[in-house]
Amino acid sequence: MPHHRLDFNVNANSFGVLLFFLTLTICFISGCAPKEEGPDNVAKVIGSMTDSLPIISLPEDADPEAPDWKGVDLDPKSPVKPSYPAEEAKQFLLPEGYHIDYVLTEPQIEQPGAISFDGNGRMYVLELRTYMLTADSDGTLEPVSRISRWEDKNNDGVYETGTTFLDSLIFPRFVLPYGKDCILTMESDADNVYKYTDTDGDGVADKKEFFTNKYGRSGNVEHQQAFMYWGMDNWLYSTVNAFRVKETPGGVIREKTGYNRAQWGITHDDDGKLWFQGGASGVPSYFQFPIHYGTFKVENQFAEGFEVPWGAPVKIADMQGGMDEVRQPDGSLNRVTGSAGNDIYRGDRLPRELYGQLFYGEPVARIVRQIKPVVSEGLTTLHNVYQEDKSEFLRSTDPLFRPVDMVTAPDGTLYVADMYHGIIQEGQWAQKGTYLRTKIEQYQLDKVIGLGRIWRITHEGNERDKTQPRMFDESPADLVRHLEHPNGWWRDKAQQLIVLSQDRSVVPELEKMVRESKNLLARFHALWSLEGLGALDKVLVGQLLKDQNPRMRIQAIRVSESLYKDGDKQLAKNYSLLMKDTNTDVAMQAMLTANLLKIPSLRDDVTKLMTSNSAKGIQVLGEQILNPVEIRGWMVDKGPELTASQQEAMERGSIIFNELCVQCHGLDGTGTPLGNGTVMAPPLTGSPRVQSHPEYVIKTLLHGLEGPLDGKTYPGSIMVGMGDQSDGWIADIASYIRLNLTNEASIISPEQVSEVRLKSKAKIGPYQYHELLASVPQNIAPSDRWKVTASHTAPTRIGGTDSPSSAFNFEGWTTGETQKKGMWFQIEFPEARTISEIHFNSPPKRRGNYRDRIPPFQSYPRSYDLQVSLDGANWNTIKTGKSDSADTILSFEPNKTKFLRIVLTDDIEEEGEIPWSMRQMKIFGLLQNEKLLN
């Protein structure tokens, strides 16, 4: 909230002085305060509520004796009215000695979903301004959300100065500060992550750069990926996605990980282990082992009673599951049903017993839970610290308290983001006739929108640290000193900025800290800083593998994985030896690393270890390493199903890659390292180029490629053409690269290679990069200048945009009714351009509920004409076709057109309501003065 300076000029006569002090006294007695600037959002919400109490009836299909309805109170009720922040603060219940104060509220921010700090202590707020504005999710995907940035310039503990760093966003998924005046973020239903930078210092991003692609997922806004998070290992992780990404001098690379099954929240502990937060499960989702080792199943991870929340009485019983989830008589939640935001508290200004414990929000229960992790025989069990008291760390009697994120702050305290919102369930589960919808209407919860607060939790006797970070003004050498700070936030941020700087002048100082510091955590961060700078010394790592402290040995094992991938295969002997370590945690870490890297002696080593060490963790890991079971992901695409012949092609491609390509591109496709952060050849992992049009890879393999690539020059500056190889050989290696190394593209057939070989037979010598791009159809980014229309359109999901232009993203477009002859979808370009291909996906549509086994219907167009026009009046049909699968590719001779239209040519003959749907549409054309989609 802003602080206001009261300026006055009192005449020095007795009447003026008397009047001034009389006014001051009245204000003191009555508690008056300076009037808030800007709109009064609380008053606006209250004003939107009806004075006549809604009359609520039992829905027609509801069974009053069913568990979710039995005993429901449907009497008319007064609306749940929002409180001002000072009044909400009085409704919190905290353990003795703790205090909570707001640091930022509406109207400055609205509907905060996450918070994060940059190197100067400025707080970025992810404002999800379209979340549940109505019970039907209307407007969720409108471009009005934002990321704002806030500062406490006068150091009074309140963030009074802010800017809208990035505006007009479609439900952004995360905000990650990424260096000075720079963030990473992406929007819902999108596939690309972008880097936004403020280049002129006005607090508003003015530069947008592509960072990485293939990051998105389909689904409603609750089920898409979120929370890009910088781990201590210098990789970037996110919820949902089973991979991690990392920016290197050669580009952004990616590696596969296990399935984290998380929705909203990632944090890490002092040892760098990530803790993922589940959503609908209401509990942490994956936390036993670092996620990049895969997903291992562990039983009994939660103490008895863990799934029972102990919120304060809220009385309104607005739980999605109905009356059987309501604790009587206080109306609170009796079993966790949602969770959001998490933090391993690593600050230095709260009681020491909180350090290293997990905090997360349960916004349906209106609680923040404190978790004590208990490790026994290498496995972790989670305990609610206040379980015996039937309580929680933070509770509220205000039904609108919605804790959705929390972080250890630069001042050493704990911050909580409170959306302070009426509805906290996506509209798909709040439809007419549901129990939740009944409660929403009964208490007018849909009216409570546009609010939000950020809270600071402190403890008496522990003043917040008023040292304001100024890391952007410091040298890398200054940053190294912060690695010894008692507050984990300072250590994490200093490491991140050291790595982003790529300034190797601090390597000697970092190596000295690793060897000599008395601060174990500083040694950890210094070691990972060296890794991030590409400056790991084999001798140093070898010494650390024998360190007296087992936690240091574990870090040395993890960091050595980078050296192993860079070719130091002698480390396999160390891993075998460390599996015999007397410390169970060290032995388990050696198992995990050996399994990840698939060292030759893995099975023998693990079998011997399981025989000699009976610890539960050893047995659980060993059994699943020796006898792996398929672990299903959650909301994660599996990739294309391969036929037997295609799988054989993959195996042949793997042999080619490992015999030939690894020499320059490295075993994992990240480029063979040459030291000083350079690699021999461009990374192939997660490569936008490799995953683009098939002709790019085919032409490169046939004819070769030389010179700078995207402005970067590599020591192995020429890729020799292999046109003397057969079409099948080219197809095998091209397919392997496009479907492995964390790439997710299409398989390539020998017939495709033959066609490209024929088209490019006149080419002599290797391509230059710009020349290759000019010859390959490019995926053209959709523009706001494109006019996209359709004969029929309907939302593809509850809260959808009902817009044909959604065909270009994960939301998709649909006719909403059965396919009929004459239905059309049209694109009008700003000016005529040459196009040659159209790709789109038509997802199967489920019918019935999950209990029914009704096969889904296929929504691809059964028969169609592809038409083009230069004036929108005279049309030519350039292709006639029939789709028979979810993925449709329309290829044709390059054609210059201003209008492009797909028209259905027949009525559908199948039974049932089968609309036409398209999503992730891609238009390919020749290079033009138009932005290309990376």
Labelled PLM ranges:
Residues D156, V448, T678-I747:
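Extracytoplasmic electron-transfer domains, predominantly the class I c-type cytochrome c fold
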Residues Q647-T672, V690-H703:
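Sequence/structural segment immediately N-terminal to covalent heme-attachment motifs in c-type
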Residues K35, Y386, T458-T467, G532, ...:
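Post-cleavage N-terminal segment of exported redox proteins
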Residues S805-N934:
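Aromatic, loop-rich ligand-recognition surfaces of beta-strand-rich domains
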Residues P34-D478, W489, V499:
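Beta-propeller domains with acidic blade repeats across secreted/periplasmic ectodomains
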Residues M406, A417, I454, G653-G669, ...:
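The canonical Cys-X-X-Cys-His
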Residues D465-P469, R491-Q502, L521-A535, L540-K546, ...:
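Structural detector for internal amphipathic alpha-helices that build alpha-solenoid repeat scaffolds
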Residues A62-P79, W634-E648, S654, Y714-D784, ...:
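Flexible coil segments in periplasmic/lumen-exposed cytochrome c-class electron-transfer proteins
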